[in-house]
Design a protein with these regions (language model features):
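Pocket-lining segment of extracytoplasmic ligand-binding domains
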Residues: 86, 160-253
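Secondary-structure end/capping motifs
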Residues: 220-298
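Small-molecule pocket liners
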Residues: 37-38, 107-113, 196-197, 208-212, ...
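Bacterial N-terminal signal peptides that target proteins for export
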Residues: 1-10
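Short, glycine-/small- and polar/acidic-enriched structural segments
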Residues: 26-153, 161-162, 178-182, 204-206
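Sec/Tat signal peptide C-region and signal peptidase I cleavage site
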Residues: 20-24
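Conserved C-terminal helix/tail region of periplasmic/extracytoplasmic solute-binding proteins
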Residues: 289-321
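Bacterial N-terminal signal peptides
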Residues: 9-18
Length: 321
């Protein structure tokens, strides 16, 4: 009997130890891109310091664009990430079980339609029939839709060339496409290194919000971690807004950019992450409706169905100055 009790006690102890190790080894997996506040947060390490108090590690994974990042969320390789406005719309249309968590203020100058410096294209009207490179389903996809609508050009009257940023730049450099719709830092690099000319940025066409998203299961199981991430993003954004030169010096080597190009990127960003408001959700609904009308997504969407509602305690904390 004593042996049985001892064996049971040992089993309980081992289970307790295993549970403790599992908790100690818990990891939140975050996807980021070569743009935005997350790259500064990663460089400063403040999120790691905060979550370490709860035995949580942070694992960072870089993605070339929003569609690729959201695919990572969809297949479960990351828990949380940041994209522009359009990728979540395409992901929702494809059935991905993701939720909008927070957003940054608009940054319309940090995406643009670029043409080669000697291009005969002088206005949006000249885009008719042209080959235009873009990352399909990325934030700039909506910019292109809006720009064409402004010029009265049906989407079917251009030749979209869907390429990720690195391949799109190569095509742009060798003259295989007539224009390139792209975001920072690729935009700034093309402006400074290739002397690309800006046909238009998103001013008056698209807000270019950055959105923070999570898998629905992660947000449900770990609301405090989600809140901590958003809080740290907000804090580092406030710091970055007040110290743009320091941020540029910090991220320039991470982005493999000259300092003056990094400064251009930093100054065009929006800072100040907040949980999703009804107004921002309504703007996303307009984007979803536009893509549905063009049949670029297979069905109409309801954005509010995929907006995360944070616990009251997190909303109260976020409202404090």
């Amino acid at each position: 009997m004593q042996f049985s009790f001892t064996r049971s006690l040992l089993a309980v102890s081992l289970l307790t130890l295993a549970a403790g190790l599992a908790q100690a080894e818990e990891t939140v997996r975050i996807g980021y891109q070569k743009y935005g506040t997350l790259i500064t947060l990663k460089a400063r390490g403040t999120l790691e310091q905060r979550l370490a108090k709860d035995g949580v590690k942070v694992q960072w994974t870089e993605f070339p664009g929003g569609p690729q990042l959201l695919e990572g969320l969809n297949v479960g390789s990351i828990d949380f990430g940041v994209t522009g406005e359009t990728p979540p719309v395409f992901a929702q249309a494809a059935g991905a079980d993701l939720v909008y968590v927070a957003h940054e203020p608009p940054a319309p100058t940090s995406e643009a339609i670029l043409v080669p410096k000697d291009s005969p294209i002088q206005s949006l009207n000249d885009l008719k029939g042209k080959k235009i490179a873009l990352n399909k389903g990325s934030n700039v996809h909506y910019l292109l839709v809006q720009a064409l609508a402004k010029a009265g050009i049906p989407y079917k009257d251009i030749q979209p060339v869907y390429l990720p940023p690195a391949d799109a730049r190569a095509a742009f450099e060798r003259g295989a496409v007539d224009a390139w719709v792209i975001w920072d830092p690729y935009q700034a690099a093309a402006e400074t290194r290739l002397q690309a000319r800006t046909l238009t940025d998103a001013t008056g066409l698209a807000d270019n919000h950055q959105f923070y998203l999570a898998t629905r299961s992660f947000a449900k199981a770990h609301p405090e971690q989600v809140g901590a991430i958003v809080d740290e993003v907000r804090s580092v954004g406030e710091w970055a807004k007040a110290h743009p030169d320091e941020v540029a010096a910090q991220v320039a080597p991470l982005l493999n950019l000259p300092l003056d190009t990094a400064e251009r990127v930093v100054k065009r960003q929006g800072y100040g992450a907040r949980f999703i408001s009804p107004e921002v959700a309504a703007q996303q609904q307009k984007i979803a409706d536009a893509f549905a009308a063009l049949k670029l997504i297979p069905k109409p969407l309801v954005i509010r169905d995929v907006v995360w509602t944070p616990p009251a305690s997190l909303q109260t904390a976020a409202a404090k100055p």
